[in-house]
Structures are given as structure tokens and as C-alpha cells.
């Protein structure tokens, strides 16, 4: 005959369970708040104290290692806080939800709570999401994915992101696209980021963007290097926004033109090798072509935050060199073929009162050529 032990859980154990779980369901992927109604937001107690190993020998997952210490079945190590639905799941299908899986879920949930509650108050950051139409592709911007990439260095200042997005039927190859998107971005920036920077206690911004490269450069120019900004990069492998390890041998390569007396052009061959003839088709043969590249250009080379720091350093020095040879009255023609985060940081490096005009080009898929998209004036970042 099976023996049962008491279901009674000491108040001290129950309080510790609530604290460790932060009042949320510990079933992996649920995370439901258990002290407030999701419908009315009224205070309501919906939590259940679920045993990993059962208080009954014939119950789900049995007694396990507690068979020789039944008095410890109600200890904190054998309890999960769960909602009613998840409690039913784990007890009705113990084969599907074995003890080692539940212990792992409990441990990871409690570790996450400890880390989050240990983050200093100055680690708050506004999550900025900027997306625009790119050919036929849909935006990969998902708030939860962005928050995961920030963690544990920063956590969101608000439950919702700062959205800089245009719901336009225009495509980047259509007439009027650049003018419409540029004007919309300026207006949205003024109404959101500029307002937060002026009046909000939190003045840090985590930027996640996936848009045509000229618009990303414009966004960076609006942000400037005066705002406290962390720019993120969408990676293909491994997929996501989280920064990866750094290759110590990495460096950016700057190629200077032999002739520095002609009108200047700046080519970024980072995501792919770019034939210089593509630039000459647009500007002609009389030009001084500066180029920034890497040893093996490809579309997923930028994996580390340190690489982005090195890019900023290289750009600041390069802009000084270009102005030294060409002055700041001659416009600089910019041809970007590079990651989104590099585009934003290029714009942030711009000094509106000191730099020449930037004429930014984009690859037009309809004619397979670079075409002029935006002009950033020397006296402003617009």
C-alpha cells in the first residue's frame, strides 16, 4: 500500500518559492503572472505549488531520491510555482515532463530572476526598432528577440518599444520612396527619440534596425554620437541579434586613392566585394575613390561588438583624412555595401557642422545600378 506524506508546505518555504519565481509560472515558455488577472488586472491568487517528485509514491514521477527522506519532499528544491494549466500538464504526462527537465526549468527560471533583479537601475534602455520596406522582405524585428539580445547588460525601460516604422506601400525602387521615408523618419525621430532624450529619466537607447542602407545612415546621423546608444546587428549564423565572440586578428582595411585631387567617393566593400567600375559608371572616371573593406567581405562578417568599435575608430580617422585632402566644401559620394549596424554608426560619426555634404547611393534592383538616394547636408544631419 502506498504511503503519503503531508501536503502542508511551511509558510517560509512558500514565501521563498514566490520570491525565487518572482510570482510567475516556472513552466518553460509560460512565465504567466500568478498574482494578477490577465483580463481585468485585478489582484488574484492563481498560483499552485507543484511538486517535481510527488508527495505520493504512486504519483507523477514518484518519490525519486526522496524515498529515503520523505520529510524533504516539501522543501524548496522539489517545488515549482505553476499556473493551474501547467500544473495539470506536468502531472498528467510525467513521461513527457520528467523530473530532470522540470529541475532544469526551475533552475533556469530562478537564475534569470536573480540576474534581472540584480541589474542596477542605470541599466535601463529604450528599445528602438526601425524597419522599412526592403524589396519583398518582411521585417525580422521582434520585441522579445531584441530584449533577449540586450540582456544582461541592459533591460527595457518600457514594456513597449520605440517604433520608427513606415507602413508604406512604396518599395525602395519606386519613385518618391526616399523622399517619403526620409521625411517620415525625421518626423518620427522628433516625436519619439528626441522627446525621450529631452524629458525622460532614461536616456540610453538600444537600436535594432533593418532597413535600406541610406535610411540607416540617416538614422545614425539623427542619433549623433551625443546620445548614449548601443547599436545591434542582426546575424544570420547563429541567427539573432546577440553579439558573438571576437576574432583578435580582425581589422578594417582602408585603401586610399593614388590621385587625391579629383572629386571624392567612398566605397564600403564589407558585405561583398564591389567592382569599382560600378562606381565609375555613376560618377565617371575623374574621381578619387577611397575604400573601406575587410580581408574576406561577406554578409555575416560582423559578429562582435568590438568589431563595431573598430569600425567607428576607422571611420573617424578616415573622415579626417578625406577632409584633409578634399576640404569640406566638396561633396562626398558614399556607396555603402555593409551591415546595418555599420550604416548606423557611419551616420553617428558624421559631424554636421564640420563635414562636407554626403550624397548617399543605394543599389537599385530594377536597373542593377547604384542610384542617388539621400543627401545629408554639411550644415545639418538632414
Q: Where are these predicted regions, by residue range?
A:
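Defense-system signaling and execution modules centered on TIR/cGAS-STING-like, death/scaffold domains
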Residues: 1-4, 62, 93-168, 214-226, ...
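Redox- and metal-dependent alpha/beta enzyme cores, enriched for Fe-S-associated oxidoreductases
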Residues: 247-318
Amino acid at each position: 500500500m502506498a504511503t503519503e506524506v503531508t501536503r502542508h508546505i511551511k509558510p517560509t518555504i512558500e514565501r521563498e518559492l514566490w520570491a525565487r519565481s518572482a510570482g510567475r509560472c516556472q513552466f518553460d515558455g509560460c512565465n504567466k503572472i500568478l498574482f494578477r488577472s490577465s483580463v481585468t488586472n485585478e489582484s488574484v491568487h492563481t498560483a499552485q505549488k507543484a511538486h517535481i517528485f510527488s508527495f505520493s509514491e504512486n504519483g507523477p514521477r514518484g518519490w525519486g531520491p526522496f524515498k529515503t527522506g520523505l520529510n524533504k519532499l516539501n522543501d524548496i528544491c522539489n517545488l515549482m510555482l505553476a499556473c493551474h494549466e501547467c500544473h495539470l500538464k506536468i502531472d498528467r504526462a510525467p513521461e513527457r515532463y520528467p523530473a530532470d527537465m522540470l529541475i532544469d526549468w526551475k533552475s533556469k527560471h530562478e537564475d534569470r530572476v536573480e540576474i534581472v533583479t540584480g541589474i542596477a537601475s542605470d541599466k535601463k534602455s529604450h528599445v528602438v526598432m526601425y524597419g522599412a520596406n526592403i524589396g519583398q522582405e518582411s521585417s525580422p524585428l521582434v520585441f522579445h528577440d531584441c530584449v533577449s539580445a540586450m540582456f544582461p547588460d541592459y533591460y527595457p525601460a518600457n514594456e513597449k518599444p520605440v517604433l520608427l516604422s513606415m507602413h508604406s506601400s512604396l518599395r525602395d525602387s519606386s519613385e518618391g520612396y526616399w523622399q517619403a521615408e526620409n521625411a517620415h523618419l525625421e518626423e518620427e525621430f522628433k516625436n519619439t527619440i528626441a522627446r525621450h532624450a529631452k524629458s525622460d529619466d532614461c536616456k540610453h537607447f538600444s537600436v535594432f534596425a533593418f532597413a535600406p542602407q541610406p535610411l540607416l545612415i540617416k538614422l545614425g546621423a539623427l542619433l549623433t554620437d551625443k546620445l548614449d546608444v548601443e547599436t545591434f546587428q542582426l546575424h544570420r549564423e547563429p541567427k539573432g541579434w546577440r553579439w558573438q565572440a571576437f576574432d583578435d586578428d580582425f581589422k578594417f582595411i582602408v585603401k586610399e586613392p593614388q590621385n587625391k585631387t579629383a572629386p571624392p567617393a567612398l566605397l564600403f566593400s564589407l558585405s561583398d566585394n564591389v567592382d569599382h567600375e560600378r562606381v565609375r559608371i555613376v560618377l565617371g572616371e575623374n574621381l578619387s575613390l577611397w575604400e573601406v573593406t575587410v580581408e574576406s567581405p561577406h554578409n555575416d562578417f560582423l559578429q562582435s561588438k568590438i568589431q563595431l568599435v573598430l569600425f567607428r575608430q576607422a571611420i573617424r580617422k578616415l573622415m579626417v583624412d578625406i577632409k584633409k585632402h578634399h576640404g569640406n566644401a566638396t561633396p562626398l559620394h558614399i556607396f555603402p555595401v555593409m551591415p546595418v549596424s555599420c550604416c548606423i554608426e557611419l551616420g553617428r560619426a558624421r559631424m554636421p557642422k564640420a563635414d562636407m555634404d554626403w550624397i548617399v547611393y543605394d543599389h537599385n534592383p530594377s536597373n542593377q545600378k547604384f542610384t542617388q538616394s539621400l543627401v545629408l547636408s554639411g550644415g545639418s544631419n538632414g
